[in-house]
Amino acid sequence: MLRSFLCRSQNASRNLAVTRISKKKTQTTHSLTSLSRFSYLESSGNASVRNIRFFSTSPPTEENPVSLPADEIPISSAAELTLEESVASALGFSESGDYGGTSVEAVGEDGDSEIVAIENEVYQFDDEKLESVLSLLRSDEESLEFGLNALNVDLHLDFVVRVFESPGISGKNLIRFLKWATQNEEITVTTSLVESLLVAIASDTRRMDAYGLWDLVKEIGEKESCGVLNLEILNELIALFGKLGKSKAAFDVFSKTEEFGFTPNAKTYYLTLEALCKRSFMDWACSVCEKMLKSGVLSEGEQMGNIITWFCKEGKAEEAYSVYELAKTKEKSLPPRFVATLITALCKNDGTITFAQEMLGDLSGEARRRGIKPFSDVIHSLCRMRNVKDAKALLLDMISKGPAPGNAVFNLVVHACSKTGDLDEAKEVLKLMESRGLKPDVYTYTVIISGYAKGGMMDEAQEILAEAKKKHKKLSPVTYHALIRGYCKIEEYDEALKLLNEMDRFGVQPNADEYNKLIQSFCLKALDWEKAEVLFEEMKQKGLHLNAISQGLIRAVKEMESEAKVTEDGNLLAEA
């Protein structure tokens, strides 16, 4: 678009002008036929009134004028036509309508006209003055206007355009030059000048120049029916402020669009939202989005996806979903990756998970086969909400229609079933997983074991542990930790101690937590400080540290038992 601005500005500078040269032509008289011919050429648009001027005098009075109807006007003879062509050729006219840069204004009365004088104006640049102006504009001269006045330039619109096309001039100086030039009544601000100015400032990306241009545009726009601005200029100004990171200025331009008599289009909304969202001005962005939705104007494909992504990143998933709904209404296609992004954003909030579920139905074909992430996100959210029923239903739908669920998706459902205490359902999902050729990992078994251990169902937990030992040579510390806590909860400390001793055989090194849990259980519940002290010695040998609280418990239980024994011995002696 900026290239088209520049081309239009270059086309405007084809007629070069500064020095005027006047020439006088010989006085000539033409017939009605010749006059009508000039008039036709003038009306065809090839003639320009400002270059050649014809001045007519009163024709000689005929003694017996004959008035003929229009349809009976005699046609000139061949000789007359030949004479006319030679005269036209002498004046620089040709049959093709090429006047050599001149134009005609013909005036005639009663079918006869005398051409008294022809003034041919040819405009040429004074290259020295042009270079002087450019040199001044490329400098940092503070008194720029004074310097321009001193050059005594014969201003013309083409001269101004030529200055704007010249490289190396700052946007600030171009604006100052334009304001100085428009003090001349013959120079007015045109669309091409504003476009050229926008091109120059956009290439430099200087913040203050951009603000200066906006002030000029506002001044132009506030003049009613000026016809200089257009929507594309405002759009590019919004883009410029967005590039500079000046979101407030971009929003100001957007707010003035309708005031200047233009209706925002899809590009206007897109550029404004881009400028606002990238700087997290989300309140303004939401108001622009709301206006866009009401207008029904929406970008295509990638741009629409970008708008959705910007809102999702800023936590505005509902606004993004509104854009998606409008796109569906207008049957606009959205690239699948943007659909997945929106589904993921909707899954973060329990209140919008329903929208995410509905959007899964919009994925089809290749997009659905590759859509494991959005499906997994929805199942994860349903499990977080403990909506196991819908989570399992979606899992079965994935098995039936795709995308094929992996271990991670099955684990989500198993975990949700275990947390809700529905361990039988968890085992069913585990069997379903195995039936599809998937090997449950240690985490899957651990989740079910933990569920059984929390419920005190240690026999069932041991069954799952035995199954896990068959499938995996190395288990997880979390697996044993859950079992040890389960046995301690039902006060079967010897079973817990057995598990601690077998951990090494399955590639698991007991950590301080397991020892600490058992030591505290032996001290507080079993009051067996001797076993607690044995475990403490094992920890020392393995280089593990027992916290001070547990060490204090061992000493306290040991002292308490000693005091109890002394008291008991004293009582026995007293009885004796």
Curated annotation (Swiss-Prot):
Q: Which domain of life is it from?
A: Eukaryota
PPR repeat ranges per the UniProt record: 230-264, 265-299, 300-336, 341-370, 371-405, 406-440, 441-475, 476-510, 511-546
What Pfam families does UniProt report for this protein, alphabetically? Answer: PPR, PPR_2
**UniProtKB keywords:** Mitochondrion, Repeat, Ribonucleoprotein, Ribosomal protein, Transit peptide
Q: Write out the GO cellular component annotations.
A: mitochondrion; ribonucleoprotein complex; ribosome
**Is this entry keyworded Ribosomal protein?**
yes
What does the subunit comment say?
Answer: Component of the mitochondrial ribosome small subunit.
Q: Which family does it belong to?
A: Belongs to the PPR family. P subfamily.
Q: List the protein's name.
A: Small ribosomal subunit protein mS80 (rPPR6)
| Species of origin | Arabidopsis thaliana
Q: Which taxonomic lineage does the organism of this UniProt entry have? A: Eukaryota, Viridiplantae, Streptophyta, Embryophyta, Tracheophyta
